[in-house]
Amino acid sequence: MEQASIDVIEEAPRKAAPRNTEKKRELALHALSSLAELGFARMNLRDVAQRSGVSLGVIHYYFENKTELLTYGVVLYKEDFVKDIKTLIRAAPDPATLSGGVADFLANTVAQDAQVHRLWYDVRAQAQFDAAFHACVAEVEHALIDIFVALLTKLQTLGVKCRETDPLRLYILIDGWFRYFLQQQLKGDVDAPNAFRIKVLEEFKLLAV
C-alpha cells in the first residue's frame, strides 16, 4: 500500500479544524507501516516518530497516546479496504466475475498488505483486555459485516439463490480463512495467497443453491 507523504507538519494552533483533521489523517497513514512492523505491544510513539521521519512533538500534538494513533490508523486503512471491495462487488456484471473478483482482491490483499492487516487482528485482540479499543473494533467490524450485506444483495440481484443469507455468518467464515492465510503469509508461505483464492472460490460454489 502506498503511504501518504508528509513534507511538513507544523505544530500550529488548533484553530483550523479541517486542516488539522487532514494532517492527522496524513500522519496516521504515513506512520502505518511503522505500526505494522512493531505491533501494539512493542510500539511506542518515539519509535514511530523515528521510523516515520516526523518529530515526537508532532505525533503528540495530534494523538494523546499510542492507542489513539493505532486505532485511528487502522480505521482509516480499513475504510479504504471496505470501499474498494464494495466498489468491486457493485460493479460485477455476473456471478463468475463477482466470485473471481472478490477471490482475487482478498488474495492480493494477503499477498501485498499482510503486515498492515495484521494490525487489525492486533487491535481486535487488545479489545478483549482494554475498553479503549472497543469503539474501534465495533466500527470496523460493522463495516466488514456490511461487505457481506453488499455481497448477498449483489448475488440476489444477479439471480443467484444462496444457501446462506446471514451476512454475519459469511463474515465469520471468510474472516477465519483470511486470518489463517494471513498468518501463513507472514510465516513465509509463498503459496498462501493462491491457496486463499482457491478457498474463497470454493466457498462461493458452496454458497449457491
Language-model features: locations:
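N-terminal intrinsically disordered/low-complexity leader segments
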Residues: 1-22
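Helix-turn-helix
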Residues: 26, 30, 34-68, 72
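Solvent-exposed, amphipathic alpha-helical segments
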Residues: 30-37, 84-88, 119, 123, ...
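Anionic, Ser/Thr-rich low-complexity intrinsically disordered regions
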Residues: 35-38, 58, 140-148, 177
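Hydrophobic alpha-helical connector segments
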Residues: 75, 86-116, 167-171, 194
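Short, basic, alpha-helical segments at the C-terminal edge of helix-turn-helix-like DNA-binding modules
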Residues: 75-81
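Amphipathic alpha-helical segments used for helix-helix packing
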Residues: 112-135
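Hydrophobic/aromatic-rich alpha-helical bundle segments in the mid-to-C-terminal region
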Residues: 132-138, 142, 155-208
